Amino acid sequence: GPTNQKLPSYAHAVGAIYRNSDPSDIAVTAAGGLVGEVVQVWRPRELNTHETEWGFSCMSYEISGALGIKMANPNKDVIAFVGDGSYLLYNSDIYSSVITNNKLIIIVCDNGGHAVINRLQLFKGGKEYNCLLESSNTPNLVGVDFAKHAESMGAKSEQVNSISELEEAFKRAKKSDVTYVISIKTHSYQWLEGSAYWESPTLEIPNTKENEEALKLHKEGKAKQRQGV
């Protein structure tokens, strides 16, 4: 639901958009932490209104995929949820959407790096290592103004600082006749509960308590896998 916390989570941002969306709106996301949050929060109300590229974790599919979906569904609003990491890898189809008059609504959830991989590092008993900008060993850390960047490609855009501002911005985006990009800073460590075993290994010979616990959980999950499938 709505929140007044300083940095909202991915789930808060997705929920804000969902509450103000139309049943015919199509949600698109891929890779990173957004897929898990969108799948739990976004409950489709019509057929063919939820596109999640999950299996191959194709970072930067979000905007390009949304463009293709918009071309196939010109009378529907297509909403792309994208993290800052995926956005930086590939974003030029914002320009493509503008010059071909295929309006998209793009929600950039900026959590300061590749936060889901940072989460994986910690869950597997490791320490933070160059996945979040603030914990990286960089001599000149500068932020990216995603709103201005999108505007330079012809999109309308704005930076918002709260969930209530996000909801109002989304209403403006719905009325826009050109691609509309909304950027919001989100929490780097806050995720929804609910997960399943993922066979992503850790150290076989642990050298810290964190590694030891990660190996224990890994083996417990491995023991529950179906054999020969």
Task: Name each model feature, range by range.
Residues 1-47, 53-55, 91:
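Cofactor-pocket helix-loop regions in the catalytic cores of large enzyme subunits
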Residues 36-37, 41-229:
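Thiamine diphosphate
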